[in-house]
Amino acid sequence: MANKMKTRKSAKKRYSFTVNGKVKYKKQNLRHILTKKSSKRKRNLRKSGNLSCFEVKRIKTLLPYG
């Protein structure tokens, strides 16, 4: 009987897969000390980021049932 693969919970909270198999994540630097950051910078930080293809392979090992 084969063992089940475990999902890394920290990765599950940080990353999500799109329908096409790309990986989305929330950008950093938008929690505190926001007064010195420009409106344009904060607006761009609200957008989700996409990982590059070689990082996607690593995330898929952390999230086997992703």
Curated annotation (Swiss-Prot):
Gene Ontology terms for molecular function: structural constituent of ribosome
Cross-referenced Pfam families: Ribosomal_L35p (PF01632)
GO biological-process terms attached to the record: translation
Source domain of life: Bacteria
This protein's UniProt keywords: Ribonucleoprotein, Ribosomal protein
Keyword Cell membrane listed: no
Gene Ontology CC terms: cytosolic large ribosomal subunit
InterPro entries: Ribosomal_bL35, Ribosomal_bL35-like, Ribosomal_bL35_CS, Ribosomal_bL35_sf
Family statement: Belongs to the bacterial ribosomal protein bL35 family.
HAMAP family: Ribosomal_bL35
Protein name: Large ribosomal subunit protein bL35
